[in-house]
Amino acid sequence: AEFIVFRLMGYLAIACTYVIALSLVVGLIASLLGPGDQIIRLSDLPVWLGIGFATTLVLAAYGSIFNAMGLISPKYGVYLCIVFGIWEFMMGSFSIVNPNWTVASVSISHWALQMIDAMVLLAWPDTIQWAEMDNAFGIDSGLSVFWQPPVHTLGTASAGVALLNSVLVLLMVSVAWIFIAKSVFSRREIM
């Protein structure tokens, strides 16, 4: 298992450093360019850091899945990964349209989008009010298309609970696929 974990950690060290740095740069640019009472809107930075953190967890989950698929079938693993990628794209699209669909909750992209929706609600608590104003007055701002309140709150309607659920699910997916890869790898010889 150490070989698989070290391989994944090396990949994450490079990819996640880039993603977090990119999210900070984009967050800083967005906070400078967006309208606000101050020169820099610091309330934007938690959202962009949340996007970076969600992307980091998604990279860990996808990395462990693709690593395991490559170990399960060295010859056809790449084709399995392509099919899985198409599945994830479809489920991500379904999650944007309606996050309440049960079929979408079996995808990694759904949980990442739920995590980002929860971060938006934690950073900007009036987002629900703005979405309701859009619906009430028929304003087509696009908010209702790209943002939905998080649905996995265990009945509490709390964005913090939804964020915690999303983090735990993404971590459990990563750990489960690492153990699957470990069990496959333990039966093979290193050439």
Predicted regions and their residues:
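Junction motif at the cytosolic side of a transmembrane helix
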Residues: A68, L168-M191
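Terminal transmembrane helical anchor/hairpin motif
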Residues: G77, C81-V175, F179
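Secretory targeting signals
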Residues: I4-P74
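A short hydrophobic/aromatic micro-motif that marks alpha-helical segments and, especially, helix-coil
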Residues: A13-A15, L22, F89-G92, E189
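Structural signal for membrane-spanning alpha-helices in multi-pass inner-membrane proteins
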Residues: Y18, L22-A30, G92-S95, W177, ...
